[in-house]
């Protein structure tokens, strides 16, 4: 072989640390991992080449920047769990022949697969499937990718697999695609873009958690399916850690704590997904609303109120109907005295109503920005299987604001909305916040309102504002709303779970649909830009997340009961009552425990109720005109005069510490 041929047969691969290694053409990711170390090769799941993840078995033919993907990274977990959904499907097919499979994606914590089967799955079946998955894992089946034309794939899934769901995907969703990829593991084959783990043996621990109902393609008019959820790990140790987190999550479950702390209730007599706020929960919600209203007032927002229903024509004009019709309650049909028919919808969004408020009078460039705000209740007909206490409800209240501004004011207003959202999260103890710039998918322009040029400008403005605010963000292509790009704020709670809460969204589309205008300095009409903004997102969801984040241990300013007065004996009851009244008069939410229980029992009950301050009063306190302060989860803090205690607590409450 000549020197030139030797040079051509070598490729240079740049590793994450910047070092460069040369390998023969045709080297695979597995070869690279082995060259670095046996442990890395054991942990390797896939390879990232120039930013794109591929299978470890794929030959490399050109110079590239590469990275070995392991389970320790989000990308590795995504690949591992999606591969595990195929493993579960293979196990189900072996145990329950004739089962067919719909969608089987990875999710944030594991995976699921929608299964069409004559067998009605029960809890005990999950254990059988787990056992079979581990048995398949021990077979060490090499997972093999095959590419073929879409036409050949349709024939394969019709004749070999007899899988109508994959045929439908190929004939419908992928109709513009020429070639597709399949993944084989023994006798099981599935349609998938990949990549996948190299072998079933990578899966060492399995937990299938629950079964719910679903519909093919999420359409209630289509076939009913059974959705099986699970999670897998490359070691038993990781599974045990996961189970421990699940136990802690159960302890923090907002539905459990909501009942124990008497915050909210759900009743079948009212309807699924329609929470009722009890007095203590209403206090928390009111405190949060008051907090945000005060901050908005400082920033020039104007409050409005709008109805809970609206004429369907309003939502047709905005595009919310029929765009969101699958998640809306059916229209209410009304006939007036003359027989004329009108249809109304339970309000799916507040924004169309706010746009009408804007257009109710002529606006000048001097009037802008106009910032309208409302805690408006909206309604979505979520599927019953998706409902989850407060965090996924059918009726919920959004802290909705719409800012109408001139184009030259836009970036400043986005920055102001970002600052307010950051302030809200910081005040409420969410220190880990990710920011996603949710952009449109240019390959699917028909999904969005407005022109490509409008979207280009909107996304440029969003990114400029994020850069100006120094936000560390990532871009989510295809995550935008149909009328504009968004800045989504994703908080991480005390258990490490991620929740998408607040949002700031730019909208050039609705001003066109509602013909919103203002008179410029040139005397001509111009279009304003709209910013949709909601730091909480929805009050129900935010409070549900907050309950779990704090485990019900709310900060003093937010606690429904801020202090409880605990007299040690009946002979100090009159003094305890006077202390209680002094606290109430100072605006502190306080209770008085007059039960004839021992002080230890009263303290334990107050701890269980998660009351921040316990004010203990005995003979010594009465004689000195003082009180003893005990903090929830902390213990004794010493004795104070009544006025000194009140001043101390009010300072903490005002400072929201």
From Swiss-Prot:
Signal peptide: none annotated. Binds 1 zinc ion per subunit. SMART domains: tRNA_SAD. It catalyses: tRNA(Thr) + L-threonine + ATP = L-threonyl-tRNA(Thr) + AMP + diphosphate + H(+). One of its GO terms (cellular component) is cytoplasm. It holds the Pfam family tRNA_SAD. This is Threonine--tRNA ligase. It is an enzyme of class 6 (ligase). Homodimer. PANTHER family: THREONINE--TRNA LIGASE, CHLOROPLASTIC_MITOCHONDRIAL 2 (PTHR11451:SF44), THREONINE-TRNA LIGASE (PTHR11451). Belongs to the class-II aminoacyl-tRNA synthetase family. Its EC number is 6.1.1.3. Residues 7-70 form the TGS domain. The lineage of its organism: Bacteria, Pseudomonadati, Chlorobiota, Chlorobiia, Chlorobiales. GO terms for molecular function: ATP binding; metal ion binding; threonine-tRNA ligase activity; tRNA binding. SUPFAM superfamilies: Class II aaRS ABD-related, Class II aaRS and biotin synthetases, TGS-like, ThrRS/AlaRS common domain. Zn(2+) binds at residues 351, 402, 532.
């Amino acid at each position: 072989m000549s020197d030139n041929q030797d040079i051509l047969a070598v490729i240079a691969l740049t590793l994450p640390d910047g070092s460069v290694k040369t390998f023969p053409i045709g080297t695979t990711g597995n070869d690279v991992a082995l060259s670095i170390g046996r442990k890395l090769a054991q942990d390797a799941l896939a390879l990232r080449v120039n930013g794109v993840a591929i299978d470890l078995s794929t030959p490399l033919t050109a110079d590239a920047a590469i990275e070995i993907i392991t389970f320790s990274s989000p990308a590795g977990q995504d690949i591992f769990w999606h591969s595990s959904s195929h493993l579960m499907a293979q196990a189900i097919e072996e145990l329950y022949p004739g089962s067919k499979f719909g969608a089987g994606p990875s999710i944030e914590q594991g995976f699921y697969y929608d299964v069409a089967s004559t067998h009605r799955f029960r809890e005990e079946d999950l254990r059988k499937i787990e056992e079979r998955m581990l048995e398949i894992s021990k077979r060490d089946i090499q997972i093999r990718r095959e590419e073929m034309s879409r036409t050949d794939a349709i024939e394969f899934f019709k004749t070999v697999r007899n899988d109508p769901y994959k045929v439908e995907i190929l004939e419908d969703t992928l109709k513009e695609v020429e070639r597709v990829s399949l993944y084989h593991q023994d006798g099981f084959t599935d349609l998938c873009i990949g990549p996948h783990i190299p072998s079933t043996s990578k899966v060492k621990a399995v937990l299938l958690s629950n079964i719910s109902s679903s519909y093919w393609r999420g359409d209630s008019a289509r076939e009913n399916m059974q959705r099986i959820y699970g999670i897998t790990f490359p070691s038993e140790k990781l599974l045990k850690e996961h189970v421990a987190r699940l136990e802690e999550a159960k302890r923090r479950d907002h539905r459990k704590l909501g009942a124990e702390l008497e915050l909210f209730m759900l009743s079948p007599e009212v309807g699924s997904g329609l929470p009722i706020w009890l007095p203590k929960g209403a206090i928390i919600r009111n405190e949060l609303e008051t907090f945000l209203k005060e901050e908005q007032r400082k920033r020039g927002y104007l409050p409005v109120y709008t109805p809970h229903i609206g004429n369907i024509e309003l939502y047709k004009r905005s595009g919310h109907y029929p765009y969101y019709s699958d998640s809306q309650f059916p229209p209410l049909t009304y006939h007036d005295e003359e027989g004329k028919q009108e249809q109304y919808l339970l309000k799916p969004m507040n924004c169309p109503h706010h746009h009408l408020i804007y257009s109710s009078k002529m606006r000048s460039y001097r009037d802008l920005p106009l910032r309208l705000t409302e805690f408006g209740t909206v309604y979505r007909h979520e599927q019953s299987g998706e409902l989850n206490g407060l965090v996924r409800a059918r009726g919920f209240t959004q802290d909705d604001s719409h800012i109408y501004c001139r184009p030259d004011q836009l970036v400043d207003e986005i920055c102001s909305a970002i600052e307010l959202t950051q302030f809200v999260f910081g005040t409420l103890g969410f220190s880990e916040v990710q920011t996603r710039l949710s952009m449109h998918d240019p390959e699917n322009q028909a999904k969005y309102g407005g022109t490509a040029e409008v979207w280009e400008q909107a996304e440029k403005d969003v990114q400029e504002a994020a850069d100006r605010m120094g936000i560390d963000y990532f871009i989510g292509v295809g995550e935008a709303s149909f009328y504009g790009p968004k800045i989504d704020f994703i908080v991480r709670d005390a258990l490490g779970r991620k929740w998408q809460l607040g949002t700031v969204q730019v909208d050039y589309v609705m001003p066109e649909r509602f013909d919103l205008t203002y008179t410029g300095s040139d005397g001509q009409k111009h279009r304003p830009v709209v910013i949709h903004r909601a730091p909480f997102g929805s009050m129900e969801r935010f409070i549900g997340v907050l309950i779990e984040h704090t485990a019900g241990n709310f900060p003093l300013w937010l606690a429904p009961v801020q202090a409880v007065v605990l007299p040690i004996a009946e002979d100090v009851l009159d003094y305890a009552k006077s202390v209680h009244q002094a606290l109430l008069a100072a605006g502190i939410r306080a209770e008085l425990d007059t039960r004839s229980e021992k002080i230890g029992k009263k303290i334990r009950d107050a701890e269980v109720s998660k009351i921040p301050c316990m004010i203990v009063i005995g003979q010594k306190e009465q004689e000195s005109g003082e009180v003893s302060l005990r903090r929830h989860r902390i213990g004794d803090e010493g004795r104070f005069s009544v006025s000194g205690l009140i001043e101390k607590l009010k300072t903490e409450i005002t400072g929201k510490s």
